[in-house]
UniProtKB/Swiss-Prot annotation:
GO terms for molecular function: ABC-type taurine transporter transporter activity; ATP binding; ATP hydrolysis activity. Residues 4-233 form the ABC transporter domain. ATP binds at G38, P39, S40, G41, S42, G43, K44, T45. The gene is tauB. This is Taurine import ATP-binding protein TauB. Gene3D superfamilies: P-loop containing nucleotide triphosphate hydrolases. Its EC number is 7.6.2.7.
């Protein structure tokens, strides 16, 4: 049964001649890791902003468990590419910040924050300052903070895009471990093709001008990793390589088509 439903969503910004998204329908169910991939201008971030409630669609409707999405909510936790951490707070304070705003008692919110830090392999980092953390550690703190409020859905906006290749792979593997342990549905957007194929249970490919879904793929590579298979074995699997090349070809064909349309 779908937890999150988007029905024929379109989005057009004020003053824009064309919509950024047109006629998008999708569902996100329990234990699903849905990844949106597409070239620049395909509306990936706009789609996530709609689901998060940061902006409203110009047409269609979005529902979470049958209730219309109207504005941001703790039920939809968001992890950004920019870690957006509070430099005046230590690690524990950052993870517990949303719970503090919600009025949760100090002992309970700090216990929950420590639990989430352990989940992302940062046990013992409570008193570290943000400036003392690496890029990957900052993203772990951001993930722990989003999970601390126990959201129904986790939304991730190119969360590993600013990391080096080695740290990015570590974070991908950590995400799959967290996803398996929490069983929370995840909606993630990325521009990295290998990342999309590795993580997704369901992959949607978006074409630009306006953003539309042009292909949907059901994949199991991330599930295989979560079940204990090594990332190296999965990524050397001929089926993984074939899928990655197929997706690469589709993305480049969309980019080429867009460039031809933009030529005078």
């Amino acid at each position: 049964m779908a937890l999150l439903q988007l029905e024929r969503i379109s989005a057009q910004y004020p003053g824009a001649a064309e919509p950024v998204l047109a006629d998008i329908s999708l569902t996100l169910g329990p234990q699903q890791l849905l990844v949106a991939l597409g070239p620049s201008g395909s509306g990936k971030t706009s789609l996530l902003n709609l689901i998060a409630g940061f902006v409203e669609p110009s047409a269609g409707r979005i529902q979470l468990d049958g209730v219309p999405v109207q504005g941001p909510s703790a039920e939809r936790g968001v992890v950004f590419q920019d870690d957006a951490l509070l430099p005046w707070q230590d690690v524990l304070g950052n993870v517990a910040f949303g719970l503090e705003l919600a009025g949760v008692a100090r002992d309970k919110r700090e216990a929950r924050a420590r639990e989430m830090l352990a989940l992302v392999d940062l046990a013992g980092f409570d008193k570290r300052r943000i400036w003392q953390l690496s890029g990957g550690q900052k993203q772990r703190v951001g993930l722990a903070r989003a999970l601390a409020a126990d959201p129904r859905v986790l939304l991730m906006d190119e969360p590993f895009g600013a990391l080096d290749a080695f740290t990015r792979e570590q974070m991908q593997e950590l995400l799959l471990q967290v996803w398996r342990r929490t069983a929370k549905p995840v909606f993630l957007i990325t521009h990295d093709i290998e990342e999309a194929v590795f993580l997704a249970t369901d992959l949607i490919l978006l074409a630009p001008n306006p953003g539309q879904i042009v292909e949907r793929l059901n994949l199991d590579f991330g599930q295989r990793y979560a079940a204990g298979e090594s990332a190296r074995a999965i990524k050397s699997d001929p089926r993984f390589i074939e899928t990655r090349e197929h997706v690469l070809a589709r993305v480049f064909s969309q980019r080429s088509a867009t460039q031809q349309q933009e030529r005078p």
